Amino acid sequence: AVLHSLAHTLIKGSFLLQISVVGKMYGNYKVTRNGGYFRADPLGALVMVCCLLALIAMPPSVLFRTEYLIFTGLLSGGLWWIFVPVALLLVAVIYWLCAKILPLLSRPADLEQIDREGRNPWLSAVLLLLVVVTFAAGVWQAPELGALIDKIVY
C-alpha cells in the first residue's frame, strides 16, 4: 500500500503539473476542447502519454504490480464482494482517463492560437524522469523493498 501510494503521488503529481502547462499554452483547462498537443509540445505530450499509461496500470508500471498484488490479495482472502466493485470502478476510471486525455493528444487544432511560450521543457524533462522511475520500479524492485513488502504481506 505504501509503494502504491508513493507511485500514485509521483505519477499524479507529474500528470497534474503537465496539465498546468497545457492550461498555460491553451489559455484554459478544458482538456476536451483542446487538441494538437503532440505538435505543440512533443516532450510534454510524451509526459502525458507516459502518465496515462502509468495511471491505467499498464505494465511495466509499478501501479500494475501493486494493483495486481491488491487484487490477488482480495481474491485469495475470499473478498470477492470488495473485488467486484473496485474492479468496476477501476475500469470506469481507465475509460474516463482515456476519453479525456487521448483527444487532447490526437485531435487536430489550430496551432496559431496556442501560446508556445507557455511550454516548459525543463519541467517536462523532470516529470518524464519521475514517471520513467516509476516504470523502472515496476520492472526492477530493490531486494530490501521486496523483503519489506513480503514482511508486511506475509
Residue ranges and their predicted role:
Residues 137-154:
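Juxtamembrane boundary at the C-terminal end of a transmembrane helix
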Residues 1-118:
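Functional transmembrane alpha-helices
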Residues 87, 126-137:
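Hydrophobic core of alpha-helical transmembrane segments in multi-pass integral membrane proteins
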Residues 83-84, 125, 143:
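Enriched - but not universal
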Residues 117-128:
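C-terminal membrane-solvent junction of multi-pass transporters and transport-like membrane proteins
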